Amino acid sequence: MTTKKKNQTDQVVEVLRNEGGYATFKRLNEVVDFSGWATKTPEASVRRIVQNSDKIFRVRPGLWALEEMREEVLKKFELKEDDKKSEERFTHGYYQGILVEIGKLRNRKTYVPAQDKNRLYLGRHLGDVTDTTKIPNFSYDFILRKAKTVDVIWFNERELPSDFYEIEHTTDIKNSLSKFYELQDFYAGFYIVADKCRKEEFEDKLHVSMFKPIEKRVKFLTYDRVVGVYESLQQVELNKW
């Protein structure tokens, strides 16, 4: 009896199953065996498969899972569909983890707040993914108290902050801008990470007199933009914000 040859979709499904039912797009491209694929752009083929196959569903941008294991995967992520609280918690941890991974590739020391160390990122605790949950002693105590609440910070080799990231899924963007205002004396980048639908709100809240000193320094990054850089980590120097 001859074994049926697996097509490309079958291979992607098998990899997802072997990975526990889910994988990032980046991980799929690392694990799938492309040796028998008659294409010069296998990554594009994988993207088409995950987007079009009814066997696969999107958990978040860049993160895909098997429909047959939906319940198991969502339980692992502590993610309940149509539950805003669990969606907020998962989304926050997911993008914190992605920013940590990008930071590490850029040879930055990565930090997330101690109160976030037990948040999940692809089945792992953020405290096990980031370099530290204890903020380096780079300034006065009153400055550190403000800085240590920032969602993700990258530090350079001198342990000075190079980039501050705040993830705004549903919370008030003004609170993050206020943090950045207090940290403006550092030679660092300031980033709001959110869904593209919040760009107009970001602009409205940034361009007020209070935030004039930082309005040209704060950038808005969409979830898709962050994931796009993560998926091209080997080309990260070509994918700067």
Which residues does each predicted region cover?
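Charged low-complexity interaction tracts in eukaryotic proteins
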Residues: M1-T9, E19, S35-D82
